[in-house]
Amino acid sequence: MPDHPLSSGVAFSHVPVLAETLMQVLSEQPPILWQNTAVIDATLGGGGHSKLILERFPGVRLVGLDQDPSARAAAASRLEPFLDRVQIVPVNFAAFEPPEPVSLVLADLGVSSPQLDVASRGFSFRLDGPLDMRMNPVAGGETAEEMIARLDVNALADLIYAFGEERLSRRIARRIKADLEAEGAYAGTAALAYAVAGCYPPKARRGRIHPATRTFQALRIAVNDELGVLDRLLQTAPGWLKPGGVLAIISFHSLEDRRVKTAFLQEERLERVTRKPFMASEQEQADNPRSRSAKLRIARRRPDTARSGP
């Protein structure tokens, strides 16, 4: 049962990315795979993908994992018609172990629209809010504000370069540390975004991609250990699957996609469904701009491998 009370007023709307493509691939698998079985949505979010899966496959029971309380509440509301087949677990997928082999593990690695659009979460450079960026503030942990204050200029530059692939990382880190020395702290996300944008030439500040995008990505990844968590999922998820079970991962930047691609190539228990990733159609990109960078990679558990750990 859900860990969170149902609420029809949860302000958490999320358009699932590459949903039609995912459902098409799942529908092409042997029908027996979806009979009297469990599936895992490792990044439940608002429950958009999960709702489609439950509608299409009445023989599945779904376990939804999410560490974000607002996401769990929204998913419980959206999935209310299926609650006899749904369990929502308040956990990061890196800390989960299913009690039985499953037919599907799905992970959508993107930050959801509600997280980006709620200023108080601190993820957005377009809306002013506290420099937080924690996926699960209730659990504690270091905020983005605390992290940039703790790191020296070289460590901060290395972080922005490694996790944001930001070519101006050293200039940005010097600006951040100079501002902190002069002001003590940034007033919020808007002040940090303004400082980062100021490190770019004027012409570069007017492009389609905001100049602060890569820096904010880097800080969010570091605050939540997103790549470490993904690595642990890629190590453990193949062992969760039944023979023929599907592992589907949607990534949104090259750091994630490279890890997924490499794992699918090197993991002996998996075989790729396609060599190249699925990407959003022009129509989906027009309807949902956040799908532009999405890549869906899908692999199957080889039928001749016994369930085991990494």
From Swiss-Prot:
One of its GO terms (cellular component) is cytoplasm. GO terms for biological process: rRNA base methylation. Belongs to the methyltransferase superfamily. RsmH family. One of its GO terms (molecular function) is rRNA (cytosine-N4-)-methyltransferase activity. S-adenosyl-L-methionine binds at residues 47-49, 66, 93, 108, 115. Keywords: Cytoplasm, Methyltransferase, rRNA processing, S-adenosyl-L-methionine, Transferase. This is Ribosomal RNA small subunit methyltransferase H. The gene is rsmH. Specifically methylates the N4 position of cytidine in position 1402 (C1402) of 16S rRNA.
